[in-house]
Regions:
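Domain-level signature for soluble enzymes in the chorismate/prephenate branch of the shikimate pathway
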Residues: 1-320
Length: 320
């Protein structure tokens, strides 16, 4: 047989599959109606497991895993279709609909916002991109920002989530598992690190360099040019600039130009990050879910079984 012959055969089989799939889904609709009438749940795990074992046993031995994967997906699609027909609701769907109905059309501009660090931090720069006239409250730690939202001290909080060079901010992901919050918006901020010193300090005078651990990671190659200089992590880049301003002239900070102006420092070298295209994504969190017009991103955290197909089963629900 030629390749075209095989493809023609595949086309013929696909037409049959599509017809049978439509019949299966129509039958699933009948099952949904029966379950609704008798108050039965959409998911019947015992039936699904029995069916999966049965169809896998019918397949040739070298195709059983493929058959099981195919039917696992079919079960997901069937449940999704039944749930849609039944108009199934959950606390989450109710929360989402309530948020859509109650969230105003315009994102607020003059509100209380929690940020980690001190004035000049990159979180503040991200905050200024998100809000026109924010009332910023600074906190010593990321956890304190989460706590300020939970306790109602601030309506919003701004936190760094991931960087294009250094990757995820792991401390934030760890705290996400502990706190109750919602992501309202996010913003992508270009991050340029600069070597800041007190006026008059020369490169040869530097014995210590301060910055946040993420910034140090983003400037790792650059820092190799300072053998013998002590590299000291601190709370954030603005705190690093503050320490240099209060020091004796032998320290430097990897920080922003806004910190240079704010703390009266000089820039010895600009844009010293290892990657010129260096961006950090910041999230804006709130206590309650708010969905503003134009919202087009969904963020979620999930703990899944450590087994093949567990992530696929979750993602397939979004695709369906």
């Amino acid at each position: 047989m030629e390749l075209s012959d095989y493809r023609a055969r595949i086309d013929q089989i696909d037409r049959q599959l599509v017809e049978l799939f439509a019949q299966r889904m129509n039958t699933a609709a009948g099952i949904a109606a029966y379950k609704k009438e008798h108050g039965l749940p959409v998911l019947d795990p015992v039936r699904e497991r029995e069916k999966l074992l049965d169809v896998a046993a019918q397949a040739p031995e070298d195709m059983r895993d493929y058959t099981a994967s195919l039917y696992t997906m079919l079960f997901e699609l069937s449940r999704c279709y039944q749930g849609r027909l039944l108009g199934s609701t959950s606390p989450l769907t109710t929360e989402i609909q309530t948020a859509i109905d109650q969230t105003p059309n315009l994102f607020p501009s003059n509100v209380s916002v929690a940020c980690q660090g001190v004035a000049g931090a990159y979180s503040q720069l991200a905050c200024d991109k998100l809000f026109k006239l924010p009332h910023i409250m600074y906190f010593a730690s990321f956890e304190a920002v989460f706590a300020a939202i939970e306790r109602g001290l601030c309506r919003y909080g701004v936190l760094p989530l991931e960087n294009s060079t250094a990757g995820s901010v792991n401390a934030i992901y760890d705290l996400m598992m502990k706190h109750d919050f919602r992501i309202v918006r996010s913003v992508r901020l270009k991050v340029d690190h600069n070597l800041l010193v007190k006026p008059g300090t020369k490169r040869s005078d530097i014995t210590e360099i301060y910055s946040h651990q993420q910034a140090l990671s983003q400037c790792e190659q650059y820092l190799q040019a300072f053998p013998g200089v002590k590299v000291i992590p601190c709370e954030n880049t603005a705190v690093a600039a503050q320490k240099v301003a209060e020091g004796d002239g032998h320290a430097a900070a990897l920080s922003s130009r806004s910190c240079m102006k704010l703390y009266g420092l000089e820039c010895l070298e600009a844009g010293v990050q290892d990657q010129g295209s260096n961006f950090t994504r910041f999230i804006c969190i709130s206590k309650n879910l708010e969905i503003y017009p134009g919202a087009d991103r969904t963020s979620l955290m999930a703990v899944l079984p450590h087994e093949p197909g567990s992530l696929c089963r979750v993602l397939s629900r979004f695709y369906a």
